[in-house]
A protein has these predicted regions:
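Conserved Rossmann-fold cofactor-binding substructure of NAD(P)-dependent oxidoreductases
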Residues: 23-46
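Amphipathic terminal alpha-helices
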Residues: 255-271
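NAD(P)-cofactor binding segment of oxidoreductase domains
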Residues: 39-82
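Catalytic helix-loop patch of NAD(P)-dependent Rossmann-fold dehydrogenases
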Residues: 93-133
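Substrate-positioning beta->alpha
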Residues: 139-149, 158-181, 187
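Conserved Rossmann-fold NAD(P)-dependent oxidoreductase catalytic core, especially the SDR/UDP-sugar
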Residues: 68-108
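Conserved C-terminal active-site "lid" loop/helix of NAD(P)H-dependent oxidoreductases
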Residues: 204, 224-250
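Mid/C-terminal beta-alpha module of Rossmann-like enzyme folds, strongest
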Residues: 174-177, 182-229, 271
Length: 271
């Protein structure tokens, strides 16, 4: 396995920079509109690059900056990983989707993600560096899960017959990225757990774990939702992770029951 001499990470806030430092990660403050000399220098030394910044209306600001200088900006780079979203597939009427399925994004943010995937892949080809595109399902983990929503009074059991969502624990995102890094893999990979599930079932489990009554079920037609929340319910698909598992990756949390139960038992659900 690859062992890093050092790891650096960007953040937009001083508070999160301190948290990175406590984890042994060199923190770098990132702000769109240009790289600091420290960030430019770190990129010149970097051998592996993992990106998760969402593209804006004008595209990916990091890619735009690197593209100005090409290989000279990242002379030691050996591998690029771009974290995208399964939202690029759009709606498939609850059918299974693989990496070969047609991408037909609905939202503007998913359209931008798809275009950015293509742009990073082109950049990798131009500088002869392999690029792995990781299409992530709905992320949960410490501080971001149904137990937190329940504790804050924000959890709702909205029922739309047949609707399922796909999920992935944050530990499995890190695990999959590390596995693909060690394999020097390139191409597109779905990063999702084994069990697409109705969202109301996840809230019910959170209530069971915490020993409280679950909130009442609300028919989708009667639910008051923000435009973004409603957009999620306009898409339904079952994301296959067979390609990732075919490369030998074993999920730490293959379904939401195991992931949520572990968060509760360890107390890490709070973040």
């Amino acid at each position: 396995a690859h062992k890093a001499d050092s790891i650096a990470g960007t953040t937009r806030s001083a508070e999160k920079a301190e948290a990175l430092a406590r984890m042994g990660i060199k923190p770098l403050i990132y702000a769109e509109g240009g790289f600091t000399p420290e960030l430019t220098g770190t990129l010149r030394e970097a051998t592996h690059l993992i990106l998760s910044i969402a593209p804006g209306e004008n595209g990916d600001a990091v890619l735009a900056e690197l593209s100005r200088h090409g290989r000279n900006a990242v002379p030691n780079l050996q591998w690029i990983c771009y974290l995208s979203t399964v939202g690029v597939y759009g709606d498939h009427d609850c059918a299974e989707v693989t990496e070969e399925s047609e991408c037909r994004p609905i939202s503007a943010r998913s359209h931008r993600r798809l275009e950015t995937e293509k742009a990073w892949s082109r950049f990798g080809s131009e500088i002869a560096v392999p690029v792995a595109i990781l299409r992530l399902s709905g992320i949960y983990g410490p501080g971001r899960n149904a137990i937190v929503n329940l504790a804050e009074g924000a959890a709702r059991r909205i029922v739309k017959p047949g609707q399922v969502f796909n999920r992935i624990h944050v530990d499995d995102i890190a695990g999959a990225a590390r596995h693909l890094l060690d394999a020097k893999a390139h191409g597109t990979f779905n990063v999702s757990d084994d069990e697409p599930s109705p969202p109301q079932d996840v809230v019910a489990l959170a209530a069971h774990l915490t020993g409280v009554e679950p909130p009442p079920e609300i028919p989708f037609e009667e639910a008051k939702l923000s435009p973004m929340a409603r957009s999620f319910y306009s898409e339904c698909k079952r994301v296959s992770n067979a390609k990732l598992k075919g490369l030998g990756y074993s999920l730490r949390y293959p379904n939401y029951r195991e992931g949520l139960s572990a968060l509760w038992k360890t107390g890490l659900w709070r973040g």
